[in-house]
């Protein structure tokens, strides 16, 4: 069953919830105050109903929302960026960045992109190819690249079009306080 809500209230959503089935709630907002209010209300409802929330990676940057809510509500979100901190290349980059600049590369945008890592990925993947192939880069460009922020899959819609990135990850917060990618083929 679908319950459409607006910005004003969540009071009438409970009748749509099922006690014996998982209730998937999609919150299409990047407004911190709204997302926080909805999540607080869903925490209360989750005491009586199983709830999973599909939200936004921008919520990771919201200071006023308790990160425990993400785990209690099993937050899922899609993101084109996924940093695996167990990856030796990522660990080495962070160590070298810290030694060079005196701080950790933590600045992200509202989609979860690490600016320092994006710059590094672009420098390591694109610039060497641009110097090597110059004007013929388009014909020699490798559309499947691995970077610090995950795999990059680029596709062209036509022979006269540029490349568009099509990599996407689904991230899941677990009740056990894990944060893991959901893998699919």
Predicted regions: what they are:
Residues 6, 31-35, 86-90, 112-123, ...:
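Solvent-exposed, acidic/flexible segments
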Residues 28-31, 35, 57-59, 68-69, ...:
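Short beta-strand and adjacent turn/loop elements
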Residues 1-39:
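Extracellular/periplasmic Venus flytrap/periplasmic-binding protein
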Residues 39-117:
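Extracellular/periplasmic periplasmic-binding protein-like sensory domains
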Residues 2-4, 27-32, 55-59, 78-82, ...:
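Active-site-proximal beta-strand/loop segments in catalytic clefts of secreted hydrolases
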Residues 18-20, 69, 161-164:
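Extracellular/periplasmic catalytic domains that process cell-envelope and extracellular macromolecules
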Residues 11, 15, 36, 40, ...:
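Solvent-exposed, polar/charged alpha-helical surfaces in well-ordered, non-transmembrane soluble domains
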Residues 103-116, 120-183:
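Segments of small-molecule ligand-sensing domains
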